[in-house]
Amino acid sequence: MKFVIKLFPEIMIKSESVRKRFVKILTGNIRNVLNKYDDGVAVVKHWDYIEVRSKNEENRAILIDVLGRIPGIHHFLEVDEKPFTDMHDIFEQTLADVGASLENKTFCVRVKRKGKHEFSSLDVERYVGGGLNQAIETAKVKLSNPDVTVRIDIENDHMMLIKARHEGIGGYPIGTQEDVLSLISGGFDSGVSSYMFIRRGSRVHYCFFNLGGAAHEIGVKQMAYHIWNRYSGSHKVRFVAINFENVVGEILEKIDNGQMGVVLKRMMVRAASKVAERFGIQAIVTGEALGQVSSQTLTNLRLIDEAASALVLRPLITHDKEAIIAMAKQIGTDDIAKSMPEFCGVISKNPTVKAIKEKIEKEELNFNFDVLESAVQNAQYLDIRQIAEQTEKDVVKVDTVSVLSANDVILDIRSPEEHDERPFELAGHEVKHLPFYKLSSQFGDLDQSKNYVLYCERGVMSKLQALYLKENGFANVRVFAHGNIN
């Protein structure tokens, strides 16, 4: 099984030294991610493409899925590589591989060639195309918009028959740009803005300001872990949780109502700047869009930025909400965001849309900055992979089981895409599918006389959701111990 990885076009136009560095980084990223699923995979870099090989045919579906989510890959080709002797041998091998798929179809043959041969690419197209047309009575040659395009790449004495083309997400490989710190709230905007910087080649760390208690933090951790695991699992990143409840309390008590929203955002970027400085991160990323809410006018955004010592970047600044939601759906964060309340909006009833600097600074003189300093000093710093370990400690009242009773139902909480690609079954036991992001709204509708054992491939979401359900009064929930079984 072989895949040929084609690079993002902007990589191709870089200088030779930059291009080599980018390709080297992308090769390492691909290897780091694929080794989690197939420890026998081989990744080899070439000048203008990267080659991925595996002997484990059963891993085909997961490798295709994962390659389609690695930044830096424009598209990749699934190929069947074989040696050949002459043009007739190329024709015979092509007929054996694709003949059945051309029945009752129109087709054309396209060839790319490297190396020294006695024939040209056009010669091969004509010879193979003519041969297929004669050998398959119901097939017909059509050079424009055919039903099937037979693609063959020839390099020296080997031919590659292209079986399928799969699209990547493009962008730059992670690690080719500097790190950023994303202020993630769990809503549509912050998830999408985080993804946009991942796709642009930055390693994205996450900073969460907790305004809503344990349930809010669990939801945000789910989103951050989902984005990291799907799109940037090649790199270690940090998840920073800062309890902002006392900061909000100080604002509610001492700041004029109309200025609360801007002051809160200024406190957030001050705190985030301290975190960024600690880890040598150059920029803060937010999901703000111009005019979307009262604090997001140009006047207010400028005042917010003045409180930051780090560069503040807003990739969604000109995006419509509809476009942002569509992108959230594309990357798989929309359902998580739908269940996440917006806490910032509840603290100011009559927010100003054009804050005055002198007035904001005067209001902040009433604020006890020791409260902000304490919040930053007591921040929780996690390697995002430790979310599972931390949850293991938190979910002390949730049983982990490997042997099931007759009253136990396995609840597969993976996303629909993961469920469809790798269905989970266990002989003798009922398995239901309910995506993790629907548990909060639909778990109560299940038969509560049953015990539900949560299943996901790595166990992280199962443990997070078990904690959430326990906190909401559901005692009939446990975690499946063999969460890494496919």
From Swiss-Prot:
Q: Which Pfam families match?
A: Rhodanese, ThiI, ThiI_fer, THUMP
> Can you name this protein?
tRNA sulfurtransferase
Per the database record, which ranges form the THUMP domain?
61-165
Entries under CDD domains matching the protein = PPase_ThiI, RHOD, THUMP_ThiI
The organism of origin for this protein: Mannheimia succiniciproducens (strain KCTC 0769BP / MBEL55E)
Residues the record marks as active site? C456 (cysteine persulfide intermediate)
Q: Which InterPro entries match?
A: Rhodanese-like_dom (IPR001763), Rhodanese-like_dom_sf (IPR036873), Rossmann-like_a/b/a_fold (IPR014729), ThiI_AANH (IPR020536), ThiI_fer (IPR054173), ThiI_N (IPR049961), THII_Thiazole_biosynth_dom (IPR026340), THUMP_dom (IPR004114)
Question: Residue ranges of the Rhodanese domain?
Answer: 404-481
What UniProt keywords apply to this chain's record, in alphabetical order?
ATP-binding, Cytoplasm, Disulfide bond, Nucleotide-binding, Redox-active center, RNA-binding, Thiamine biosynthesis, Transferase, tRNA-binding
Which pathway does UniProt place it in? Answer: Cofactor biosynthesis; thiamine diphosphate biosynthesis
The UniProt record gives the binding positions of ATP as L183, I184, K265, G287, Q296
| GO biological process terms on file | thiamine biosynthetic process; thiamine diphosphate biosynthetic process; thiazole biosynthetic process; tRNA 4-thiouridine biosynthesis
What's the catalysed reaction? [ThiI sulfur-carrier protein]-S-sulfanyl-L-cysteine + a uridine in tRNA + 2 reduced [2Fe-2S]-[ferredoxin] + ATP + H(+) = [ThiI sulfur-carrier protein]-L-cysteine + a 4-thiouridine in tRNA + 2 oxidized [2Fe-2S]-[ferredoxin] + AMP + diphosphate; [ThiS sulfur-carrier protein]-C-terminal Gly-Gly-AMP + S-sulfanyl-L-cysteinyl-[cysteine desulfurase] + AH2 = [ThiS sulfur-carrier protein]-C-terminal-Gly-aminoethanethioate + L-cysteinyl-[cysteine desulfurase] + A + AMP + 2 H(+)
EC id: 2.8.1.4
User: NCBIfam families under this entry?
Assistant: ThiI_C_thiazole, tRNA uracil 4-sulfurtransferase ThiI
Family label: Belongs to the ThiI family.
| SMART domains cross-referenced by the UniProt entry | THUMP
Q: Which domain of life is it from?
A: Bacteria
Molecular function terms from GO: ATP binding; CCA tRNA nucleotidyltransferase activity; tRNA binding; tRNA-uracil-4 sulfurtransferase activity
